[in-house]
Amino acid sequence: VNDFGDLNIDESLISSHDGQTISLANGCVCCSISNDFNQTMINLVKRIEQFDQVVVEASGVSEPERIMDIARLDPELSPSGIVVLVDAAEVQNNSTNSYISNTVLKQLQTAELLIVNKTDLVSKEKLAELEAWLEGLSPNAIQLKTSGGLIPAELIFGEKINDNFFYSKP
């Protein structure tokens, strides 16, 4: 669990926390706490027989490509792809916000899977415009439209379709 601030709010919201969740607070995985992240990944590799995959859910201000670069440092890890959750109603506004635009655009451009969420909150015309806009930013990314954040688990834990990403059609 990675929170940007001093308080690890997300960790406290996870009701099934069983001691197997690793918390990283007070910074972005790819920036100020990257050493903690590196050590955490090394520790996970040592326990690799306990699980098949590790999913890193980074904060909204993270740089996914830098996280992948960190994971690529260890020869025992094989990073499998960058998934970005897109708010269909807000992403274009966020992409022009002077505080977060660079981060938003970089996340979209490095994605291999764009999960376009909240599609029920935009018109069909807006959705078609958004789809074309995303295609221009990330032409090689797979786009999946959904609402309520509902996606099949196979999208994250599915079969490998190329050297970088696992995906199974629902």
Where are these regions (language model features)?
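Nucleotide-state-sensitive switch-loop elements of NTP-binding domains
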Residues: V1-N102
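Short internal beta-strands
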Residues: V1-N2, I115-N117
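Short glycine-centered, acidic/aromatic-flanked micro-motifs in structured strand/loop junctions
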Residues: A58, N117-K118
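Non-catalytic interfacial helical region
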Residues: R66-A71, A89-V104, L108, L114-V116, ...
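Well-ordered beta-strand positions
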Residues: G81, E112-L113
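C-terminal accessory "lid"/substrate-recognition subdomains
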Residues: K106, T110, L121-P170
